[in-house]
Amino acid sequence: MTPATIRPLQDTDRAAWLGLRQALWMGSDATTLAAEAGTLLSEPQRFGALFYHVLLALDGERAVGFVEVSLRDDVDGFGGRVVGYVEGVYVEPRHQRRGLGRALLDAATQWTRERGAPELTSDVLPDNPESLAFHERSGFRRIEHRASRGKQQTLLTRPTS
């Protein structure tokens, strides 16, 4: 386990966070990702989220990973119950396999629990077996396969208690 720090996003972290977002969603336009990030923080309801939160993993003063987590009442299979939802999680390749991703998910789970939601959920595309294995190692279990936005996905959940 690395001695990295996990903490909420601060205004001074925005450029680093945007760079990490672009690394995760490589096929996306940087301008679009930046605009989306601003809206996520100021108006999460526009993206269907009740609340939105970003946590960073820092190696010293440098951001090397993040998790974006929201509270949602529109996740399929949960009957309108509010659950935490991992919108994205990323750790720079050279910092992977040091426990940072798990620490980010643990912090997202704690944030979700503190807001009264019983579960943290996530989804993974079938062409990403590394992410599926990472989620399962981090305490998530598969609950269903579903189509969302024209793509098949595996929905996973992890209790917050």
Regions found by a protein language model. Give the residues of each.
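Conserved GNAT acetyl-CoA-binding A-motif
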Residues: 112-124
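Acetyl-CoA-dependent GNAT
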Residues: 8-15, 19-81, 85-88, 92, ...
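Conserved active-site alpha-helix within GNAT-family acetyltransferase domains
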Residues: 102, 114, 126-144
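Extreme N-terminal starter segment of soluble prokaryotic enzymes
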Residues: 3-5
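Conserved catalytic-core motifs of GNAT/GCN5-like acyltransferases
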Residues: 74, 121-124, 136, 141-158
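Conserved acetyl-CoA-binding loop-helix of GNAT-fold acetyltransferases
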Residues: 91, 97-110, 136-137
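Short glycine/proline-centered loop/turn elements that form peptide/ligand docking sites
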Residues: 105, 129, 152
